[in-house]
């Protein structure tokens, strides 16, 4: 009887192992990454826009003016009320300044911000062994990716001053790294999708 149960346990283990599929092939991972993230455009906002600032805010004016010259922001002269301390008391006074907005006429601009590239897979670093968790089969893929098709406007600004843009410019040599969960469903692997979708950041 003991021998029977040993065989039953081994057989059950063998069936369970056999039921778990092989991990996704690198070609499938690349294809699924391109489908899931390759068309996902990357957007950047130098500040929360539209933004109204005084002319005397030289540092901010200098920062935003380079985006105006690059054609992705617009600048308009304006006057608005600002609180100033006068004679020891706060008062609202009319000041001269600028209003900065996204340049909707630019091909690089959308309501989401300023386009600065889109993801491309760089290297598949590791693929875990598939696991059955509560009747659902998952595996984890550790990969690196970079920002591709960087737009020309980046060459017209000091991109080193903005971390997101700096990382994008350097990402071919220093790629981003990400762990993504994959699920085996309906006989094939796919990027795991839940109520909160996986992101690259």
Question: Model-found features: residue ranges?
Answer:
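Basic amphipathic alpha-helical segments that dock to polyanions
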Residues: 57-75, 79-84
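Short amphipathic alpha-helical interface segments
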Residues: 20-54, 58
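Mixed-charge, low-complexity intrinsically disordered segments
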Residues: 89-103, 149-173
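Short beta-strand edge/turn micro-motifs at domain boundaries
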Residues: 140-142, 147-148, 168-201
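Accessory beta->alpha helical hairpin/"wing" motif in late/C-terminal subdomains of nucleic-acid enzymes
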Residues: 74-116
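Sec-dependent signal peptide recognition
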Residues: 2-10
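Extended amphipathic alpha-helical interaction segments
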Residues: 104-139, 148
């Amino acid at each position: 009887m003991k021998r029977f149960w040993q065989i039953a346990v081994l057989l059950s283990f063998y069936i369970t192992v056999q039921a778990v599929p092989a991990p996704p092939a690198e070609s499938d991972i690349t294809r699924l990454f391109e489908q899931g993230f390759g068309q996902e455009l990357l957007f950047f906002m130098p500040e929360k826009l539209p933004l109204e600032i005084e002319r005397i805010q030289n540092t901010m004016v200098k920062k935003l003016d380079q985006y105006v010259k690059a054609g992705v922001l617009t600048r308009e002269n304006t006057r608005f009320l600002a609180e100033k301390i006068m004679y020891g008391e706060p008062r609202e006074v009319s000041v001269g300044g600028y209003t900065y907005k996204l340049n909707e006429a630019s091909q690089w601009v959308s309501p989401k911000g300023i386009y600065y590239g889109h993801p491309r897979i760089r290297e598949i670093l590791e693929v875990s062994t598939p696991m059955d968790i509560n009747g659902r089969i998952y595996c984890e893929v550790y990969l690196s990716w970079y920002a591709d098709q960087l737009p020309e406007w980046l060459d017209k600004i000091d991109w080193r001053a903005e971390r997101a843009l700096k990382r994008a410019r350097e990402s071919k040599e220093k790629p981003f790294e990400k762990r993504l969960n994959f699920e085996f469903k309906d006989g094939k692997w796919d990027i795991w999708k839940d109520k909160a979708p996986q992101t690259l950041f």
